[in-house]
Design a protein with these regions (language model features):
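Hydrophobic/aromatic hotspots within intrinsically disordered, low-complexity regions
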Residues: 35, 40-41
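A structural-propensity feature for long, helix-poor, extended segments
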Residues: 30-34, 57
């Protein structure tokens, strides 16, 4: 769903990407056969990077009014990049890594009146009774390529546990993408 928000509200048709750096050819073939025509696999080599061909079609918009999806995107941006946003501490000032996200916290059990009076912090509660921490995001904000969802069981709040982890993952993913692009560019200029 996060990817659908990032792309402006269009339904997404999943596809499989092969990467020559993955050494699990048999697993790839087995998984791929569930999704694509076997004849495409017969013509593919495991050492090449390629995108499995699929039929391009007009994707259906999820929302009739594009202002609605823009409102959600702006709210996710504010949640991460504005001073009082719930995941503000996890943001990057560098525009290259700027992302939009939303925190979430899920109760594991009912909180009793007696529990409320104790006013316990998550760290003071038995592990199995602590809240689950959630965070969804897409990045980079201006030109989204990635969406991420982080769930940490019994992690406490989304802003303290899940958002910082998502932030680190987003930075690593973008850096890896840039490194891959640079490697491809260098290989082409040497050839």
């Amino acid at each position: 769903m996060t990817a659908q928000i990032a792309n402006g509200g269009y339904k997404i048709k999943p596809h499989i990407i092969y990467d020559k750096n993955i050494n699990f050819e048999n697993a790839q073939q087995k998984i791929a056969k569930q999704f694509i025509n076997d004849s495409l696999l017969d013509n593919a080599t495991t050492t090449d990077n390629y995108l499995v061909e699929r039929e391009y079609q007009l994707y259906e918009r999820l929302y009739k009014n594009s202002q609605n999806i823009n409102f959600v995107k702006d709210a996710m941006f504010g949640s991460t990049n504005e001073q009082y946003g719930t995941s503000y501490k996890s943001r990057y000032e560098n525009l290259k890594y700027q992302f939009a996200g939303k925190t979430g916290t899920s109760q594991v059990r009912r909180i009793t009146e007696a529990d409320r009076k104790l006013n316990l912090k998550q760290s003071q509660i038995k592990y199995e009774n602590r809240d689950h921490a959630l965070y969804i995001a897409f990045a980079p904000y201006k030109d989204p390529r990635y969406s991420i969802s982080v769930l940490i069981e019994h992690g406490g709040s989304g802003s303290k546990a899940a958002a910082p982890l998502a932030s680190k993952l987003i930075k690593k993913i973008i850096d890896r993408h840039d490194l891959r692009e640079q490697t491809i560019k260098n290989n082409l200029t040497l050839a």
